[in-house]
């Protein structure tokens, strides 16, 4: 059965100094946060989140909002699950026209497991190819996610994942490490941004935003 890895991030090998475990770091989109706050009679400032902003030279920064959730999977009746949780274990990536291209792992840990060929602790993670085939067989199933605001953010995530995967493969400081030794060294590299090619990411995001603006006009 489900071991709730996505909600606890508890693994013997995780020996972090800074990254919180004993719960999950969940991410909200800006409009999502506003919607949930308004529906519950709150202002955005009342929802305890940490803003993550990436200036990439577009019309405005790419922003996400992160918070630590300590419910450990027992959140029914306590909070509304964000889209991040509802989509797990995959994030769909669409073309700007709305065609489903691929399914990305929904957490940095699962991205790392996949990139290194390690088995994920997530016991409900299905075969990616089979899941993609299932989604493509019924386009209407993902229709609510084919909004330009959502698709842009999903595609932006794909750009970041691609950069991370390449940089991880070239990280000589992590080469040959496994278990706790790997994750201790990884934490510092990850949190200091050394596992990302920021010039590539910014360039790709500028092109991506320009394409969406051409097709949809102002969308975020």
Give each language-model segment a name.
Residues 1-220:
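Short loop/turn segments that flank or connect secondary-structure elements
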């Amino acid at each position: 059965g489900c071991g709730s890895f996505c909600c606890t991030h508890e693994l013997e090998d995780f020996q972090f100094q800074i990254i919180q475990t004993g719960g999950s770091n969940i991410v909200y989109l800006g409009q999502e946060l506003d919607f949930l706050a308004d529906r519950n009679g709150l202002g955005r400032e009342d929802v305890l989140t940490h803003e993550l902003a990436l200036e990439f030279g577009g019309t405005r920064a790419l922003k996400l909002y992160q918070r630590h959730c300590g419910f450990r999977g027992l959140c029914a009746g306590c909070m509304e699950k964000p889209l991040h949780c509802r989509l797990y274990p995959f994030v769909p990536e669409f073309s700007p026209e709305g065609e489903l291209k691929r399914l990305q792992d929904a957490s940095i840990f699962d991205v790392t497991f996949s990139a290194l060929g390690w088995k994920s602790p997530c016991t409900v993670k299905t075969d990616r190819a089979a899941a993609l085939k299932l989604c493509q067989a019924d386009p209407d199933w993902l229709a609510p996610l084919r909004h330009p605001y959502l698709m842009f953010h999903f595609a932006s995530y794909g750009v970041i994942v691609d950069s991370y995967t390449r940089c991880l493969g070239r990280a000589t400081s992590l080469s040959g490490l496994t278990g706790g030794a790997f994750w201790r060294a990884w934490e510092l590299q990850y949190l200091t941004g050394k596992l990302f090619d920021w010039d590539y990411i910014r360039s790709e995001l500028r092109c991506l935003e320009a394409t969406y603006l051409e097709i949809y006009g102002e969308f975020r």
